[in-house]
């Protein structure tokens, strides 16, 4: 039986843990050595509800030098993961300031599913992180409620959180990618196989 192919585009500010998250998923463990700013496109088979899809991961760099070439990564994208880091208010603000306008301009369809992902959720209660943000006159780590509100504001398909360091919620992200591809129609997720929320705090809009 031929597998469906999913082109997955991962977006978000630099240092939000996009590449680390993908490496953690593909290897099963948190990378302890050098982590590049982005990795070349790779692919893996992922199963959801007994259906296996071949998912191609496109890790898009957020560096300014790639602003002119990044639009070329959008064509044929089936699902987008848009990341912000829970310890970075700036990356949170840039979701609606920078990334959503870019997505609306270049995504192949206004109905392309978007998973808003809060990374590094292990830092939400971290004392050093909280103190550092306070010293820099920044808002505290992003709360779950704030992330959920933003996902509704940008009309994301769902909101998830993860910690690559703790390997929390990472596997679930990619199951939800397949789920979005299989069951999203006109931007609405209608999965007949489940009516309950999952363990990674998946909120369906």
Swiss-Prot record:
Membrane protein topology class: Lipid-anchor
GO molecular function, one term: GTPase activity
InterPro entries assigned: P-loop_NTPase (IPR027417), Small_GTP-bd (IPR005225), Small_GTPase (IPR001806), Small_GTPase_Rho (IPR003578)
Propeptide residue range(s): 203-205
Keywords: Cell membrane, GTP-binding, Lipoprotein, Membrane, Methylation, Nucleotide-binding, Prenylation
Coiled-coil stretches noted in the UniProt entry, renumbered to this chain: none
Binding site for GTP: 12-19, 59-63, 119-122
Modified residues (Cysteine methyl ester): 202
GO cellular component, one term: plasma membrane
Entry superkingdom: Eukaryota
GO biological process terms on file: actin filament organization; cortical cytoskeleton organization; establishment or maintenance of cell polarity; regulation of actin cytoskeleton organization; regulation of cell shape; signal transduction; small GTPase-mediated signal transduction
Disulphide-bridged cysteine pairs: none
Annotated localization: Cell membrane
Extent of motif Effector region: 34-42
Pfam families cross-referenced by the UniProt entry: Ras
Alphabetized SMART domains for the sequence: RAB (SM00175), RAS (SM00173), RHO (SM00174)
Lipidation (S-geranylgeranyl cysteine): 202
Annotated family: Belongs to the small GTPase superfamily. Rho family.
NCBIfam families: small_GTP
UniProt protein name: Rho-related protein racI
């Amino acid at each position: 039986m031929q597998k469906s192919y999913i082109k997955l585009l991962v977006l978000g500010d630099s240092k939000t843990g996009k590449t680390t998250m993908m490496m953690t998923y593909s290897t099963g463990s948190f990378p302890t050595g050098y982590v590049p700013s982005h990795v070349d496109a790779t692919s893996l088979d992922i199963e959801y509800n007994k259906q296996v899809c071949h998912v191609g991961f496109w890790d898009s760099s957020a560096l300014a030098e790639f602003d002119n070439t990044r639009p070329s990564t959008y064509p044929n994208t089936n699902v987008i993961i848009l990341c912000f880091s829970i310890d970075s208010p700036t990356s949170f603000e840039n979701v609606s300031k920078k990334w959503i306008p870019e997505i609306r301009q270049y995504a192949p369809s206004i109905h392309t599913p978007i998973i808003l992902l809060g990374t590094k959720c292990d830092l939400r209660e971290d004392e050093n992180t909280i103190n550092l943000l306070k010293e820099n006159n920044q808002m505290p780590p992003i709360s779950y409620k704030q992330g959920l509100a933003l996902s509704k504001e940008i009309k994301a398909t769902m909101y998830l959180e993860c910690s690559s360091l703790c390997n929390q919620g990472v596997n679930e992200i990619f199951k939800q990618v397949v789920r979005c591809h299989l069951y999203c129609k006109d931007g609405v997720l209608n999965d007949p196989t489940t009516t309950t929320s999952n363990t990674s705090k998946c909120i369906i809009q």
